[in-house]
Amino acid sequence: MAKTVAYFYDPDVGNFHYGAGHPMKPHRLALTHSLVLHYGLYKKMIVFKPYQASQHDMCRFHSEDYIDFLQRVSPTNMQGFTKSLNAFNVGDDCPVFPGLFEFCSRYTGASLQGATQLNNKICDIAINWAGGLHHAKKFEASGFCYVNDIVIGILELLKYHPRVLYIDIDIHHGDGVQEAFYLTDRVMTVSFHKYGNYFFPGTGDMYEVGAESGRYYCLNVPLRDGIDDQSYKHLFQPVISQVVDFYQPTCIVLQCGADSLGCDRLGCFNLSIRGHGECVEYVKSFNIPLLVLGGGGYTVRNVARCWTYETSLLVEEAISEELPYSEYFEYFAPDFTLHPDVSTRIENQNSRQYLDQIRQTIFENLKMLNHAPSVQIHDVPADLLTYDRTDEADAEERGPEENYSRPEAPNEFYDGDHDNDKESDVEI
């Protein structure tokens, strides 16, 4: 039975710019939406122009001082904020750029609205490719992330859902989400990521399992360089199957960071777009309400391909291998296909023995779980949001240029030899 899918897209979210040479490119969201539009996938979803999160919404997780700082700081006044910039870890990886707070408000509002719609059973699946910024902490920015829309979305889901499962397939450990829910059994966090050799953020060892009420409700799958589709699937499907069976979540949040693909500028895995998509399809197969978010992904053309393909899987619509013509068509040269070869020469350092050892440790930890912990009945606060559906029936009639504008920064896609990549001095 086909699911009702809600899709959140803000036409301005792709126009923000972290700065020259910065690997995080919000422009990838405009490319993704353009493909979703030109493949006709929007016809299979309810399309919303999302709510913009307020300071109050953000302070459901973050400290007031930190959010107040994000709202006030700008490139023109940042000299007066030296102490705060250091205190809140804003600077190199997380620069101050024009419209910073507005950018956070837009991607966070979409995740929050997605959670509210799932709570109110308006949809079965909610998609916000602009969200998934999993490194942000209560008191500080981290790893290109300022406001943790995932934590804020999960807090909204917890008003109605006794147990929320969070799954993270970004190449980086979902440290901000893990930290937020480390002491509770209401949220189980499961992160598959590269671990070791000082890889950012340096957390996510198998032995980080949660504490107090949350002991064993935190699960980490530390992987080595070069993991391919087959090895990843060998771990992902049995682990997620067991977790769902033991924990019995009433809602799932899936962070789909695309930096776990081969050929990512900051990544060292070897997943194909199909292999990445298979994880999304597998999570969908449990038929549990699902909030799907973006995350990392720094080879822009492949991020757009990946999230478009995953949108097609979520709406159960087969799409052609040849990309439809769009105003961004030249970005997808030379092949102009949905599934180019993204494999690299990086050797798969995840031996069968290593993967089996991880599996065994994880399954032993899962046996320690209290099956499906229950929650006392409580009063549910009123929803923070009232919102209007964007009637997208006229999307075909509008010219593509009316749907999104190109970013002002000419170097948004590639900055040449000075661009930061994995050899650079910016630690990712």
UniProtKB/Swiss-Prot annotation:
GO molecular function: chromatin binding; chromatin DNA binding; cyclin binding; DNA binding; DNA-binding transcription factor binding; GTPase binding; histone deacetylase activity; histone deacetylase activity, hydrolytic mechanism
Activity control, per UniProt: Inositol tetraphosphate (1D-myo-inositol 1,4,5,6-tetrakisphosphate) promotes the histone deacetylase activity by acting as an intermolecular glue between HDAC3 and NCOR2, thereby promoting its association with the N-Cor complex, a prerequisite for the histone deacetylase activity.
Enzyme Commission code: 3.5.1.98, 3.5.1.-
Single biological process term from Gene Ontology: random inactivation of X chromosome
Post-translational modification: Sumoylated in vitro.
Chief localization: nucleus
Annotated active site: H135
A GO CC annotation given for this chain: plasma membrane
Residues bearing PTM Phosphoserine: S424
Annotated coiled-coil segments of the chain: none
Subcellular location: Nucleus; Chromosome; Cytoplasm; Cytoplasm, Cytosol
Enzyme class: hydrolase
InterPro entries linked to this entry: HDAC_PDAC (IPR050284), His_deacetylse (IPR000286), His_deacetylse_1 (IPR003084), His_deacetylse_dom (IPR023801), His_deacetylse_dom_sf (IPR037138), Ureohydrolase_dom_sf (IPR023696)
Keywords tagged on the record: Biological rhythms, Chromatin regulator, Chromosome, Cytoplasm, Hydrolase, Metal-binding, Nucleus, Phosphoprotein, Repressor, Transcription, Transcription regulation, Ubl conjugation, Zinc
Region of interest called Disordered, as start-end residue ranges on this chain: 388-428
Summary of the knockout phenotype: Liver-specific knockout mice exhibit low amplitude of circadian rhythms, dampened E-box-driven transcription and a significant reduction in the protein levels of BMAL1 and CRY1 in the liver.
Residues spanning the signal sequence: none
Annotated segments matching region Histone deacetylase: 3-316
Reactions accelerated catalytically: N(6)-acetyl-L-lysyl-[histone] + H2O = L-lysyl-[histone] + acetate; N(6)-acetyl-L-lysyl-[protein] + H2O = L-lysyl-[protein] + acetate; N(6)-(2E)-butenoyl-L-lysyl-[protein] + H2O = (2E)-2-butenoate + L-lysyl-[protein]; N(6)-(2-hydroxyisobutanoyl)-L-lysyl-[protein] + H2O = 2-hydroxy-2-methylpropanoate + L-lysyl-[protein]
Binding site for Zn(2+): D170, H172, D259
Function: Histone deacetylase that catalyzes the deacetylation of lysine residues on the N-terminal part of the core histones (H2A, H2B, H3 and H4), and some other non-histone substrates. Histone deacetylation gives a tag for epigenetic repression and plays an important role in transcriptional regulation, cell cycle progression and developmental events. Histone deacetylases act via the formation of large multiprotein complexes, such as N-Cor repressor complex, which activate the histone deacetylase activity.
PANTHER family per UniProt: HISTONE DEACETYLASE 3, HISTONE DEACETYLASE HDAC1-RELATED
Family note: Belongs to the histone deacetylase family. HD type 1 subfamily.
Assembly description: Interacts with HDAC7 and HDAC9. Interacts with DAXX, KDM4A, HDAC10 and DACH1. Found in a complex with NCOR1 and NCOR2. Component of the N-Cor repressor complex, at least composed of NCOR1, NCOR2, HDAC3, TBL1X, TBL1R, CORO2A and GPS2. Interacts with BCOR, MJD2A/JHDM3A, NRIP1, PRDM6 and SRY. Interacts with BTBD14B. Interacts with GLIS2. Interacts (via the DNA-binding domain) with NR2C1; the interaction recruits phosphorylated NR2C1 to PML bodies for sumoylation. Component of the Notch corepressor complex. Interacts with CBFA2T3 and NKAP.
Descriptive protein name: Histone deacetylase 3
